[in-house]
Amino acid sequence: SQFNLNGAIVSADALNTVVELAEAILKQGGHYFLAAKGNKGFLFDDIEELFSNALRNMEIQSRMSSRDINGHGRKGYHQTFVLPGKMLDKKYLRKWPSLAEGCLVKNISFLTETKTGETTREERYFITSYPYSANGGPIEQSTVELMAQCVTSHWYVESTHWHLDLNFKQDAFQCQ
């Protein structure tokens, strides 16, 4: 079907991180923002390694966004890091359309439960066709902030789904 996604950034969870969806989003004028998790095999491992090396070498220090979180009985913050998609192995760049011009995104959440004081750390990774740089130069801070907002928006939808499943057993419904 036809959708006008011109300029939109479309997010999907790891289950839907498939080339066919990325192609369909791009065909309709949008950009994909797709979760990369362990169920996607080596893509996840390779992205994780790229960020690990870049952070260790302080290559992405200036390409970071940090946001405070306060609510739902938790306090903490998110850090979002962005690397150019072209850093991925060519086997992925041949497979994923527009990723060579796009971004790799890492988000780290540090959350502390206010009642218990227990702190958790979660890491999430994404691939996106959204351009890393408008002119081939360094990334703009506004792009990093936009990627951080995409992560926040993505997890807002994910947490809403979690509540629906918890209360209404939504994942148990079988549609035919």
Model regions: which residues?
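Glycine-centered flexibility motif
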Residues: 7, 30, 70-78, 165
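Conserved, well-structured functional cores that handle cations and Mg-NTP chemistry
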Residues: 1-20, 28
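Short, surface-exposed basic-aromatic patches at helix termini and helix-loop junctions that form
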Residues: 22-30, 49-52
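Short acidic/polar capping segments at secondary-structure boundaries
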Residues: 15-17, 31, 37-41
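Mobile genetic element proteins and their domesticated derivatives, centered on retroelements
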Residues: 10-13, 32, 126, 158
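Short glycine-/acidic-enriched loop or helix-start segments at secondary-structure transitions
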Residues: 20-22, 44
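An anionic, glycine-rich sequence signature occurring as long contiguous blocks
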Residues: 37-152
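Short amphipathic alpha-helical "interface-anchor" segments enriched in bulky aromatics
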Residues: 131, 141-174
